[in-house]
Structure formats: C-alpha cells, structure tokens
Amino acid sequence: MTGPDEIAELVASLTREVADFPEPGVQFKDLTPLFADADGLSRVTDALAQAASGATLIAGIDARGFLLGAAVAIRLGVGVLAVRKAGKLPPPVHAQTYQLEYGTAALEIPADGVELAGRRVAIVDDVLATGGTLAATARLLTTAGADVISAGVVLELSDLGGRAAVAPLPLTALRAI
C-alpha cells in the first residue's frame, strides 16, 4: 500500500509544469506524464479507488476525469458515468449550468438509460481549481437522484478555493499545492 505522502511525491514527480499556459502568468500543471506512466497511473487509480470506497457508480468529469473514472470503476468493480460538457449527448439529458470567469457553461448526463436514484456516486477528476465544475457535477447528480458520497482529484490548486466551493462534500486530493 502506498501512503499519502508517497502518492503526493509521485504526482509531483510526474507533473509537467508549463509556464504562461494557457495565458501569461499561469503556471499550468500537466498530468499527461502521470497518466502515461503505467505505475503512476496504477498507484493513482488505487488511491482514488480507496477514496471512493462504498460507491456503486463512479462519475468522471469531461475530459480527463473520464480516464481516471474508468480506471477507478474497473478497480472497484462498478460502473462509470461520463459527465459531459453541454451538447455532447443525445436528448433527453439532465443539465446543470455553472458560472465561469466570463459567462456560463453546462454539464450533462443522460436522462434515460442510467438509473441514478439511490446510487452511491463518487466523482473523480484530474484537477480541482475553483471547484465550479465539481460542484456543478455534484448538483447535477443529486438532482438526478444520486447520493453523491465523495469526490477525488489528483491535484488540488489550494489557493483557488475549490475545496470550500464543494463543501461539505468529502474531498480527497492526492496532492495539494
């Protein structure tokens, strides 16, 4: 078993830092090297699966949450639900809008074909920044009848206030900076 400090060090060692992306002054954290490393991906999957213990369904947020969500779901022996950006799913859908810095966005899940009532759902994503997307995902799933039990992310950008935005939802971040 890998402890939290070892996982945080692993994430740090396999995170590529990109200066001034996507705009000047931003220090982008690229997790692609972590996902491309078999041992790194496996250990991160194990840690996120432990955080999602008790879930009967994993919800992965568009887009890199899909990768992690599927891996965690397989590890736990449960299904995975892709939470999509608006316009990517055929109708009917459940939708949830949320605020962006300049405007709004929406997330969607199928309204037919997946019964969420009574399902214990854990949300998985790559990075927690402001928390807007994760909080909207939790609202969307709850509105559709799910019992959202937890959220897990690989990397939390602590200064951006995401943890407070998703409170009181239990949140596990494998590395916080």
Swiss-Prot record:
Stretch forming the signal peptide: none
Gene Ontology biological-process annotations: adenine salvage; AMP salvage; purine ribonucleoside salvage
Subcellular location, record wording: Cytoplasm
Alphabetic keyword roster: Cytoplasm, Glycosyltransferase, Purine salvage, Transferase
CDD domains recorded: PRTases_typeI
Its EC number(s): 2.4.2.7
Catalytic activity from the UniProt record: AMP + diphosphate = 5-phospho-alpha-D-ribose 1-diphosphate + adenine
Keyword Nucleotide-binding: no
Any one annotated GO CC term: cytoplasm
Biological pathway: Purine metabolism; AMP biosynthesis via salvage pathway; AMP from adenine: step 1/1
Top-tier EC class: transferase
GO molecular function: adenine binding; adenine phosphoribosyltransferase activity; AMP binding
Function: Catalyzes a salvage reaction resulting in the formation of AMP, that is energically less costly than de novo synthesis.
Family according to the record: Belongs to the purine/pyrimidine phosphoribosyltransferase family.
Quaternary structure (record): Homodimer.
Protein name in the entry: Adenine phosphoribosyltransferase
Organism annotation: Mycobacteroides abscessus (strain ATCC 19977 / DSM 44196 / CCUG 20993 / CIP 104536 / JCM 13569 / NCTC 13031 / TMC 1543 / L948) (Mycobacterium abscessus)
Gene designation per UniProt: apt
